Design a protein with these regions (language model features):
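Beta-hairpin "wing" of winged helix-turn-helix
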Residues: 27-28, 32, 60-69, 73-76
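Short, charge-rich, low-complexity interaction segments located
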Residues: 70, 74-88
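Short low-complexity, flexible loop/linker segments enriched in glycine and/or proline
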Residues: 83, 125-126
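N-terminal helix-turn-helix
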Residues: 33-65
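General helical structural elements
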Residues: 57, 70-72, 91, 113
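Extreme N-terminal segment that seeds HTH/winged-HTH DNA-binding domains in transcriptional regulators
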Residues: 1-34, 39, 89, 93-125
Length: 126
């Protein structure tokens, strides 16, 4: 992963989202140790405090848990929590933006639904 250092999204958020993606794709399983703040700092050439902040976000959400002296580990419910969070935050925001733009363009609800149905998974992944 390449961090977007010039973007508006803070680096620690990008780190936490990258770790979430690693969990979703199966790179990290339940109860498996994740990278330390120092490993992340070296991997992405960032300050260890920034990496720690990304890990802390996931720990506060219950996606990771800390074993004193051993590091951070993936919680048993991490995958479900990430999926739920992304569905409730990311998808709702995207749908809101699409509906708002459709309204601006005078696209009817039926037309919008038709457009969504026309998009196949293969097209969306391209």
């Amino acid at each position: 992963m390449i961090l977007n250092l010039d973007g508006t999204k803070p680096i620690y958020i990008q780190i936490s989202e990258w770790l979430e993606n690693e969990i979703l794709t199966g790179s990290f399983e339940s109860d498996q140790k994740v990278y330390s703040q120092y490993q992340l700092a070296e991997m992405f050439n960032i300050n260890p405090a920034t990496a720690a902040k990304g890990l802390t976000i996931l720990a506060e959400e219950g996606i990771l848990y800390k074993k004193r002296g051993l590091g951070m580990f993936v919680s048993n419910s991490a995958r479900g929590m990430i999926l739920s969070k992304r569905k409730n935050q990311t998808l709702k925001r995207l749908v809101f933006e699409i509906v708002l733009e459709a309204h601006r363009l005078n696209v009817s609800k039926e037309e919008l639904i038709s457009m969504i149905e026309e998009v196949t998974i293969e097209e969306a992944e391209e």
